[in-house]
Amino acid sequence: MARYLGPKAKLSRREGTDLFLKSARRSIADKAKFDSKPGQHGRTSGARTSDFGLQLREKQKVKRMYGVLEKQFRRYFEAADRRKGNTGANLLSLLESRLDNVVYRMGFGSTRAEARQLVSHKAITVNGQSVNIASYLVKPGDVVAVREKSKKQARIVEALQLAQQVGIPAWVEVNADKVEGTFKKAPDRDEFGADINESLIVELYSR
């Protein structure tokens, strides 16, 4: 399946929650009414969604949130299932360790999509080496930085200023002057308040 390129607010309305696809410069709630699905008849209540439908919708929501397509998402689940511990928590840990997500969490990109673009345009280094693969898994202790020639880009400066106002997660440490940060660890499940029910995804793939 090709990556969705349409209006981001429409995806958040479809899932009924903020997928953080839009910059926090303007709350997506200003543009998207989460209690209304996209389309002319969005408010019309339909039949009760089946368990399978709920599971499928949750998977779609998380895929869209992290910008991951089905084949790769399935591989993340299989890797999470092989690890010790809770499969759902392992899945989220892998997603949070993606380089594009870490760049976003550090505040170098205002959205994951913008962070992914920075990675693909070779504006990001890991431990001093250029990495242009968005799915690259960052390890605890890795130093992620914006390359010198990209540090003055207005979008990066603005994103970092905004991130400092909103708050940078505890599992990354950022040096705003150097425009670099350290990935301290993958976050524990209770450290980020994303509206995700990962158990539904586990149930779906365990059918």
From Swiss-Prot:
Source organism per UniProt: Paracidovorax citrulli (strain AAC00-1)
Pfam family for this entry, one: Ribosomal_S4
Protein name: Small ribosomal subunit protein uS4
Molecular function terms from GO: rRNA binding; structural constituent of ribosome
Quaternary structure and interacting proteins, as annotated: Part of the 30S ribosomal subunit. Contacts protein S5. The interaction surface between S4 and S5 is involved in control of translational fidelity.
UniProt xrefs under HAMAP family: Ribosomal_uS4_B
GO cellular component, one term: small ribosomal subunit
Superkingdom as given in the UniProt entry: Bacteria
GO biological process: ribosomal small subunit biogenesis; translation
CDD domains found in the cross-reference section: S4
Keywords assigned: Ribonucleoprotein, Ribosomal protein, RNA-binding, rRNA-binding
Family per similarity comment: Belongs to the universal ribosomal protein uS4 family.
Function of the protein: One of the primary rRNA binding proteins, it binds directly to 16S rRNA where it nucleates assembly of the body of the 30S subunit.
